[in-house]
Amino acid sequence: TLEDVDTEVGAVRRGSVETIAVSPGGRPVYAVRYGEQDELHSQANYNSAVAAKNPAWYARKDATTRPVVLFLGPVHGQEVEGIVGLVNLIHVAETGADHRGRPWPELKRRLEQFRVLMVPSANPDGRARCPYDSFVGVPTRTMTKYGQGTRKDGTLYGWPGAKSVHPMAGDVGILGAYFNDDGINPMHDDFFLPMADETRAVLRLAREEAPDIAVSLHSHESPPMILQASYVPVFMKERIRDLSVRVKERYEEVDLPYGDVREPRFDDETPGPTRSFNLTSALHHVSGTMAFTFECSHGSLGERAASLTHDQILDVQLLLYDEMLRYVLENRLYW
């Protein structure tokens, strides 16, 4: 819950906490930081630096600098699994153990080698409107009702129908947790002229911190999986594919399911378009980060659902975070 987020960030002692935005509903969006920030020696924004043939004009990354990781909590309020994961990751950073009391010594050790950025809940308005704290054992249709919302006659907007009206307004019975209280879905904001303060704050955070890797945490009914970002360089898609293989293998070691490993592909080779430049894409283009979307499993009941317990969902989250850190430590890009 948002109260759990407030409690956890209020107990931060080893890091720092900042309110980077206030939602239309008056709720804080927190950024939690661990580790020192290195001097970036920045003299250009990322786009201009790339045009100058050297991204180091935006941020110098070499063996003397600390790698940076950005964990972006759910921008869709019903996708609570990422909030659970990040609340527990903060607890690991502070105590070395998750809220079950399970120690994660290697994860904590790796965290201490990074500049760590966490936004536990990127859409607190949506989270506040969602009446469920978990969808484990709950029909997927119920999750869809409160996640994407309904029309006035009670019919579901569903996916991708909930993206066909934006900002979401007008024929609305239940305003889905996809949206903040102004009806903005941060995943599909106007990134060159953002409508939501939450979106602006997240992009500003990435712009100022230059993360080496960034994940946007989401959830669906299917097995967990990494999704490729659209409209980013092929070499970044190859790195995301390589990470996906590693995460899949890590899950298989402990009998956790994983979906498809998505291979790099060109976007919209035939008329459409059908691929969107979303928040994950924008994170790359504002900072050069290796950005991807991670879909956890809700553990809901449906035809495609992955039957996961609460314990397994937390393991899915924390093992992902650990593998992200391992990947960057072993495969960091220097500029």
PLM region spans:
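Metallocarboxypeptidase
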Residues: 169-335
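Active-site/substrate-binding loop(s) of hydrolase catalytic cores
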Residues: 66, 80-237
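A mature extracytoplasmic/lumenal domain signature
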Residues: 33-36, 75, 122, 190, ...
